[in-house]
Amino acid sequence: MAYTLGVVVGILVTIAAMILIACAIFKLGNKDGRVKTEYDERQKIVIGEGYKFAFWTLAALLVVLQIAVEVESDFGDTSIIQSSLGPLTFALIIVSILVFCVYSIWHGAYWGINNNKRDYIIILAVIGIVNLILGAVAIMRSGLVIDGALSGAFVNLMCGVLMVVVLGAAWIKDMIDKNRDDEEGDE
């Protein structure tokens, strides 16, 4: 498939713009105005463990996906799984990211020491809502499955669900910590 120079330039400009927007968001979300989030030593250890669990989750899910592809091929039906490998693989990546995020939240390592937690919650909520809206609009226009394959709307929905679950896990963890602090304060 040959691309024209205009398409290539458009893709590169879009990537550059997204990088700049991401840097601006990180700067806004950190108390010190830096792009990089800082973590203490305990948080770094927890983050490493979270990455390990996320990696093994992804590896196991990819094995399951490969088995499903083989089983589907053996039955001569190459419909939804093989024609949707891109969105399904992306979904597995989202699940592994979710494992990392929830593990980090649960062990107090998700928010860096220089993060403005409230700003990050707002950013995550906006990203989640935008993705859910984009996914819902695309599904209303074209459907979730097009010509036997999952549509791009599936990816938006997965990103939106990721943000909702991360925010839900953060809220639950905050409630547990608040109750624990209240109980310790009463003693």
Show where each model-derived region lies.
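N-terminal topogenic module of multi-pass integral membrane proteins
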Residues: 1-59, 71-75
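Membrane-water interface of transmembrane alpha-helices
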Residues: 17-35, 93-109, 172-173
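Membrane-interface helix-boundary motifs at transmembrane edges
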Residues: 41-49, 79, 109-118
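Hydrophobic alpha-helical transmembrane segments in multi-pass integral membrane proteins
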Residues: 61-65, 127-144
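Hydrophobic alpha-helical transmembrane segments and immediately flanking/interface helices
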Residues: 69-103, 151-167
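Membrane-helix boundary/juxtamembrane motif in polytopic membrane proteins
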Residues: 108-129, 184-186
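Extracellular/periplasmic helix-loop-helix junctions in multi-pass membrane proteins
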Residues: 139-155
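Short, charged juxtamembrane terminal tails flanking transmembrane helices
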Residues: 177-187
